[in-house]
């Protein structure tokens, strides 16, 4: 297949393909960090949303495209970075846009995927990526298929849990340091505030400062092929120096 991009020596695709969402101007966008380190804004959807818009195919001047059909797919897939090139598709929906024929001038195809079941949230991790894409394929008999992809982001909003217990834990070093901490609840939303208390029950060592970190833990694979990663998302200094009464 030819993935649409600028071709060298005239070997590029004979047309341009654009995938546009019908509510692109009003729909919220998510900021996504790519492997290159650059940040990109992509349309944000929620589970059970309708994904609709149009596909524009425009042949290059003087070109015409003979094809055996045009289709658009909505795909949800998981890619493990230690198994690159292999994708697990957990959602795959198809809409046929055109029957076999010829495209000699710009054609616009509307598409709609109603109330799509998108139960998993998009995720870009250290070792795994879960993504949703729209993929347009112009199938051809004697030449490579022409393929265009467009990413979108899925974030699901859950109801606030009826039961949200506090967290209490005790940690320390035997006969040297004994602390107890408490958080006001065990489940938080993305814009929540973490409120808690830390009690120093025993201090027999010198303390320079105390920090609170928010970490994201990621576990991929299974059994002996399990990969664990931890990433610090935020760090706060909550105490400078030793605790005093």
Predicted regions located by residue number:
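C-terminal beta-sandwich interaction modules and adjacent acidic
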Residues: 1-245
């Amino acid at each position: 297949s030819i993935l649409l991009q600028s071709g060298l020596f005239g070997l590029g695709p004979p047309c341009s393909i654009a995938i546009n969402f019908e509510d692109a101007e009003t729909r919220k966008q998510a900021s996504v960090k790519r492997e290159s380190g650059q940040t990109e804004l992509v349309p944000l959807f929620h589970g059970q949303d309708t994904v609709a818009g149009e596909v524009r195919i425009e042949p290059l001047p003087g070109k015409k495209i003979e094809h055996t059909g045009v289709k658009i797919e909505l795909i949800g897939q998981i890619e493990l970075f230690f198994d690159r090139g292999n994708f697990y598709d957990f959602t795959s929906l198809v809409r046929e846009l055109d029957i076999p024929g010829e495209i000699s001038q710009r054609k616009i195809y509307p598409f709609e995927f109603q109330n799509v079941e998108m139960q998993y949230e998009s995720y870009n991790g250290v070792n795994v990526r879960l993504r949703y894409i729209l993929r347009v394929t112009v199938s051809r008999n004697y030449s490579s298929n022409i393929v265009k992809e467009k990413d979108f982001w899925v974030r699901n909003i859950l109801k606030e849990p009826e039961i949200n217990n506090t967290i209490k834990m005790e940690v320390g070093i035997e006969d040297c340091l004994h602390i107890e901490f408490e958080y006001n609840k065990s489940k938080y939303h993305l814009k929540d505030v973490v409120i808690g208390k830390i009690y120093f029950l025993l201090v027999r060592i010198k303390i320079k400062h105390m920090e609170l970190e928010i970490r994201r833990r990621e576990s991929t694979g299974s059994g002996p092929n399990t990969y664990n990663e931890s990433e610090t998302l935020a760090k706060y200094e909550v105490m400078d120096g030793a605790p005093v009464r």
